[in-house]
């Protein structure tokens, strides 16, 4: 019985760690620049309560992505700001790109955020591309 308890504790701690594995794959967020004009650069800035991932520029047809794990406390939330255009403040949207379920730790979740001329679209395991935000 003690061995089973130790095994359960190790699995729970592994689930909350920052080290990904095949048993507990990391979640992934992708940001794709699908604007029609080559010169239209997408700027992505994501952060959580614990980390600021910095500002990244994404050229047309390219992707920026990162991996992360859910917290065992159910508090993983990643907020991102996407902007583009000559005046970056004109076309700017801030939104929650990922929010952990309070009762389920997810492993290997993939969310693809695609910036298009008319707005920001989400593709994930639940549905194909759906427009979530307008510019």
Curated annotation (Swiss-Prot):
The keyword Transcription does not apply. Residues 1-20 form the signal peptide. Its main location: secreted. One of its GO terms (cellular component) is extracellular region. Coiled coil: none annotated. GO terms for biological process: rejection of self pollen. It is found in: Secreted. InterPro entries: Self-incomp_S1 (IPR010264). It comes from the Eukaryota. It holds the Pfam family Self-incomp_S1. Keywords: Secreted, Self-incompatibility, Signal. Belongs to the plant self-incompatibility (S1) protein family. This is S-protein homolog 7. It comes from Arabidopsis thaliana (Mouse-ear cress).
């Amino acid at each position: 019985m003690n061995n089973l308890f130790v095994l359960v504790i190790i699995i729970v701690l592994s689930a909350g760690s920052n080290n990904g594995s095949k048993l507990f794959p990391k979640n992934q967020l992708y940001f794709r620049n699908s604007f029609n004009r080559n010169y239209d650069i997408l700027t992505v800035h994501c952060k959580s309560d614990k980390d600021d991932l910095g500002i990244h520029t994404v050229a047309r047809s390219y992707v920026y992505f990162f991996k992360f794990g859910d917290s065992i406390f159910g508090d993983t939330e990643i907020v991102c700001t996407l902007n583009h255009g000559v005046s970056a403040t004109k076309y700017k949207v801030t939104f929650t790109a990922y929010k952990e379920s309070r009762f389920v730790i997810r492993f290997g979740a993939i969310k693809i955020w695609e910036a298009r001329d008319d707005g920001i679209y989400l593709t994930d395991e639940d549905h194909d591309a759906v427009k979530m935000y307008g510019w």
